């Protein structure tokens, strides 16, 4: 009898044709096989859906109108059948032991969230890996361990589905920085979080392209400030501090300055 819990992987995609095969190949190569793969297409105009449909075991959900990553992720949450949920961006990659290590750590420690290491290929100085498994139960300790006020990326977490549904967590629509309020609340409501060595998420997005677009960068910066104000209000209402929040803001500004002074070369 198979007692391994099912993991639902939610992959939002908009015109990600050139990444689809690499993304889904990562999933097919996983040591862990109890997976529900939801590929949520956000009205792509390229061949993303056609490529995804060639891969076995992938459920394709198509949006009737372009709603953004938040809409796609929220739809995936509604369709999830797994005990755990993981959000996987189509242009990134994961190590072959990713889900096996996360699930085993979550089950062994009865954790609501398992926290993966991150390899940031666009900015290696922000890579964060774990050397040992550690369990956190205090809210501020969990905030500090995850640096969720600094890096709110939802794809770093394997999250118990019941936690998301019990607290009605969702991604805010029409936002650039939608991960931050979602991840922040998930960490707050979790009773136990475990850091997991050997589970690496490879973040491959080129941040320079965003920071070199003045109009879009201005919109993202304004949105980030609104999301930070949102989590500050939440923290005040629930009487706790947010470790790493100011550090994250300063690093974001320094990253902006660096890209403007030393634009990345392409080709």
Give the location of each predicted region.
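Nucleotide-sugar donor-binding/catalytic module of glycosyltransferases
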Residues: 1-223, 261
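Generic detector of well-ordered alpha-helical segments enriched in charged/polar residues
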Residues: 140-144, 232, 251
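Non-catalytic, C-terminal membrane-associated alpha-helical segments of glycosyltransferases
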Residues: 222-226, 242-267
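Amphipathic alpha-helices of TPR/Sel1-like and other helical repeat/solenoid scaffolds
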Residues: 226-233
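Short, solvent-exposed, charged loop/turn and helix-capping segments
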Residues: 237-239
């Amino acid at each position: 009898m198979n007692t391994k819990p099912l993991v639902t992987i939610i992959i939002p995609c908009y015109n990600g044709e050139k990444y689809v095969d690499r993304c889904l190949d990562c999933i097919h190569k996983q040591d862990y096989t109890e997976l529900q793969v939801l590929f949520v297409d956000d009205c792509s105009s390229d061949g993303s859906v056609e490529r995804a449909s060639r891969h076995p075991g992938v459920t394709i959900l198509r949006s009737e109108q372009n709603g953004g990553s938040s809409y796609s992720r929220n739809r995936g949450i509604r369709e999830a059948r797994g005990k755990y949920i993981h959000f996987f961006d189509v242009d990134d990659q994961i190590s072959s032991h990713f889900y096996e290590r996360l699930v085993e750590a979550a089950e062994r420690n009865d954790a609501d969230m398992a926290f993966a290491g991150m390899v940031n290929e666009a900015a290696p100085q922000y890579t964060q890996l774990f050397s040992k498994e550690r369990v956190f139960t205090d809210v501020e300790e969990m905030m500090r361990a995850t640096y969720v006020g600094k890096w709110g990326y939802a794809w770093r977490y394997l999250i118990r589905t019941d936690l998301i549904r019990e607290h009605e967590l969702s991604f805010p629509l029409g936002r650039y920085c939608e991960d931050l309020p979602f991840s922040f609340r998930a960490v707050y409501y979790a009773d136990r979080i475990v850091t997991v060595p050997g589970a690496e998420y490879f973040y491959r997005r080129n941040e320079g392209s965003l920071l070199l677009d003045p109009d879009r960068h201005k919109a993202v910066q304004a949105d980030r400030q609104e999301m930070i104000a949102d989590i500050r209000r939440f923290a005040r209402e629930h009487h706790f501090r947010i470790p790493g929040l100011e550090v994250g803001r300063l690093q974001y500004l320094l990253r902006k300055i660096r890209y403007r002074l030393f634009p990345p070369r392409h080709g």
